[in-house]
A protein has these predicted regions:
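Thiamine diphosphate
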Residues: 1-97
Length: 97
């Protein structure tokens, strides 16, 4: 089993440096570790589509974004992914519980 601490270090080693998402109890360990590390800013979002927008802005500003969310939030962000990220080929790593 991969711990949240090891996983967060792997993400950092791959250059991911911007994190956002809707808080989720299943991802709370990873969110806590990321939020406590000054190298990995975490910005909580109120909805998944808003988090997609934050990731897009971060990518355009030179960051490598990660979106953390529950699987139930996928429907909320499909329009943002298809009308923004897909069209302009803006990558976002999605970690879904």
């Amino acid at each position: 089993m991969l711990s949240s601490e090891i996983f967060s270090k792997l993400l950092l080693s791959k250059g991911f440096d911007f994190y956002t998402g809707v808080p989720c109890s299943l991802l709370s360990g990873l969110i806590r570790i990321i939020d406590d590390d000054p190298q990995t800013p975490y910005f909580p979002a109120v909805r998944e589509d808003a988090a997609v927008g934050l990731c897009t802005g971060a990518y355009l500003a030179g960051k490598l974004p990660v979106l953390l969310m529950q699987n139930s939030g996928l429907g909320y962000c499909l329009n943002a992914f298809t009308s923004l990220n897909l069209i302009y080929k803006i990558p976002v790593l999605v970690i879904m519980s």
